[in-house]
Amino acid sequence: DVFPRYLCCNADESEPGTCKDRELLLKNPHLLIEGMILCSYACRIETGYIYMRGEFQDLSFIMDKALEEARAKGYLGKNILGTGFNLDIHTHLGAGAYICGEESALLNSLEGGRGEPRMKPPFPAVEGLYSKPTVINNVETLCVVPYIVNEGVEKYASFGTEKSKGTKLVSVSGHVKKPGNYEIEMGTPTSELIYNLAGGIRNDNKLKAFIPGGSSVPMLPADKVDTPYDYESLAAAGTMLGSGALIVIDDSVNIVETTLRLISFYMHESCGKCTPCREGTRWLYQIVERIMQNNGQLEYIEKLEDICDNM
């Protein structure tokens, strides 16, 4: 066994369309702390970090206060509740880089280095923070731990599908009447999220497309709206569940323009370490911009596909 071990909570919620972790941090910071305590106890970890997005400075004050309250009650510190178990948790604010949402880039940043991904293997569980074994999970995952411990794994697994167990927090944004965060059972039809929970399309327009898992996953056309919201169903449809951010696009939108806006974000946020991403995003932007300006050619489609395959 290798010690010390570390727990890192990934609260660097930077994927466009995603805001579920922010709401958990804002409204129930002690749920996250409880989940981190349970995880640390199970894995014999004595030091935990909450790596928060740089723009979450207001939430860092809330989190620091909650940690102080937990220490005052004896839930953090030395010999917690007389068990001989020691644990302290610290917050750390990033500098706003999108790439630090990737676990190994987050670890580099937490160590004071450049926010760039590491080669894998070794994986963080073997060689993570300070080259020691590290458990790294996001806010939502750690917040589910207390429920599973209290109610039992069978109860949690009774929700969802055969391969996608439990529930999922989904951030619904875009052209809906009631954007927000909704907790659903895995396997719920995407149409249920859009038309029931989120109130339907704004101005009673028609659905044109939707991005089911944050801006980095492929968008789907409107005729796929009944796809169950779970890992295997979305994968079969040609996309991913991703970060759990459902972005709804109505028929007032030019999809080419939307694509250009998304590419511009990734072009700006590329950390520059890997050539396919660094150069590919710029070429994608230039080509799609030409199409947007009515200067496109049929051969551009093949070129775009070739660049995407290489990326």
Regions found by a protein language model. Name each.
Residues 1, 15, 96-108, 112, ...:
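Conserved phosphate/anionic-ligand binding catalytic regions in large, soluble enzymes, centered on
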Residues 1, 158, 163, 171, ...:
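Accessory "access/gating" subregions that flank catalytic or transport cores
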Residues 1-39, 207-211, 249-252:
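Function-dense linear segments that define catalytic or interfacial modules
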Residues 3, 60-186, 198:
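Hydrophobic alpha-helical positions that pack around
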Residues 11, 21-23, 47-48, 52, ...:
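Ferredoxin-type iron-sulfur electron-transfer modules in oxidoreductases and energy-metabolism complexes
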Residues 27-59, 130, 137, 143, ...:
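Internal alpha/beta scaffold segment
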Residues 33-39, 186-204:
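Short amphipathic, charge-patterned alpha-helical segments
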Residues 53-55, 83-96, 162, 166, ...:
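A glycine-rich phosphate-binding loop feature that marks nucleotide/adenosyl-phosphate handling sites
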